[in-house]
Amino acid sequence: MSENSTASHAAAMAAFKSLANNNTSSSSIPSSYKIPTSAESAKIRSPTPLNSNAAVPQNRPKRAATSVGVKSTTKPMAKSIATPISVKPSKANGFVSGVNKQRAPLPLARADSSLKSSRRYPQSKGLQASSSSSTMPKDMINSVKQSIESKSVGKDPSQKRISSLYEPQEMLKNLRSSISAKTVSGTSVRPMISEKNQAMINGIRDRIDSKRIVTDVSKTSSLSSEDVSHLQGHDLANTHTYQPLNNNDSFSSFGSSFSEVEPSSLSKANGEEDEESIIDNASATVQEHPPVNEEVAKNMNMDKTPKAKPKRRPPPDLVSGPREETSIPMFHDKSVESLPDGYSSTDADITLENDRNSSQSKFPQFPDIKKHKKTEKKGNFLKKYSRPLKCVDNEVNLLDSDEAEEEDETDSSYGKRAPQILTPPTQQVRLKSTMRKTNRRKEKKYMFNENKPWKNHNELSSISEQERKRYEGLWASNKGNYMNSVVTRLVGVDYDSGKSEPEVEEEEDSRKAARLSSKAGTFDSGKMSDQENFHGLLSVEVDQLIHGVVVRRIWKRSRLPRETLEAIWNLVDFRKDGTLNKPEFVVGMWLVDQCLYGRKLPKKVENEVWDSLGSIGLNVVVRKKGKR
């Protein structure tokens, strides 16, 4: 045992010395420490995991007997030098990943670690090619610097947008020097004009030149020297004297307005320009204008004021006829250049004088609105298919505007219509008493309901047949009670019916006339007699009366206040003897029921209530059909 341990220790020391010497060649390195090839290095760098399903490589390089993962054939050293480590084997896919390992000696372990750190595996051919093709970091830094320098602004101050002198004093000095240089040279810095801008300026110049020449030479050649001198001597500043001549309020259909000659509508500046243009055109030569300055051409659109568009002329059929007799109308805001041929500037004074003499002259209108009115057709359609309105004359069209009325007043010599006169309405105006329509359902709905009498007020001033029969039954059961015990004399009762009639003495005519005159009243005697007979004031039987005591006991059952019952008694008591006859008792009972319904007592019982009792005393039996 001791010999084997010494032999292994000697072998380990020899290996350690060989590793310590770096000058040894590759041939002196044992076969277990040879550098693997590229294929083997790739396998070593990317080992398969233990838990993966990949197969275990068969050509795995074998290490020396002293490596940790392989069991050494030699016997272990003493316990103080190396102690065995027991590791439980773990099987994964049939591969034993753990074996009994022995701890190597300390110098041998250090030599093995230094060897692993100094070991460099060569790269494959593909990796060497890629690394050789890529640039070094210095080259990359140089390329970045070159790109930055190419994009940077040069040192020339003309290329820089911001001055390098940021101090205010130096900036002011540079500004003053530049201003002084410009003033000395006398030239202003103008921006460079591109071809497109130059073409636009040339187009503006051409348009201005074309607008200055409006009329042909042939039109203005008819002007004589006298006309030109008259135009030069004409003063447009004193045109305010002709302002009241504008009395025409008519308008044409296409927006332009005819009016008499109104020099006041032309400004002085426009008039001067027109005179100059006429004089220039009279010379029959077109003057060439000098080139326009660039700044003037730029500001031409800003200074140009909007002018009125040239308006349409009237058609030739209306102008060609009475052209020589009538004055030529002028449009508002219109220059002399747009006037027709053969017109001279002296015609304006002639027309002004004629207008002073005849202020009623009116100009013809175009088109004739009276002949082409669409509202008339619409009016005829309404007349045919619509009802005529009351209090409105159907011949008058209410849809015409105020302008049409003004046009009728300002009719020309071409045609005049007689003024239309409003005719009075043929039928008398009848107003409806109400706009509501009668509905039978509503009438049936609002009929009197005895269970809800407060909802209807129909027939409140009359006693119904049903109510009258009920009150008469109550009177029949209580009439004549306690009448034999009455001590006072009753009105209309004949107490002397059993005694002999007194003899009638003859009276003189004078006494008889005096007695009749004293009894004569303001009321009609027939009317008074009917009322007396109705209330039983002249003649009545005792059995047909009801005592006041009985009436009080009956009315008290209604539980109305005593004052209300007293007011009802006063309304129906015409006898003034403490009794009531049949009509008075029935009306009193009806008033009690009305108070129970919530109606207020009237100040006087109306005659309609008394008239509703006209059939009292008639016993008529009404039989229905089919019954015998």
UniProtKB/Swiss-Prot annotation:
Keywords for the protein's UniProt record, in alphabetical order: Lipid metabolism
Bias type Low complexity, positions: 21-38, 253-267
Superkingdom as given in the UniProt entry: Eukaryota
Annotated segments matching region Disordered: 21-83, 107-138, 253-276, 297-380, 398-421, 497-527
InterPro entries tied to this protein: EF-hand-dom_pair, EH_dom
Compositional bias segments (type: Basic residues): 370-380
GO CC field: cytoplasm; plasma membrane
Biased composition (Acidic residues): 400-411
Biased composition (Basic and acidic residues): 322-336
Annotated ranges, domain EH: 527-616
Regions crossing the membrane: none
GO biological process, one term: endocytosis
Disulfide bonds: none
Pfam families with a match to the protein in the record: EH
Family statement drawn from the similarity comment of this UniProt entry: Belongs to the IRS4 family.
Summary of the function given for this chain in its UniProt record: Positive regulator of phosphatidylinositol 4,5-bisphosphate turnover and negatively regulates signaling through the cell integrity pathway. Involved in rDNA silencing.
Name of the molecule in the record: Increased rDNA silencing protein 4
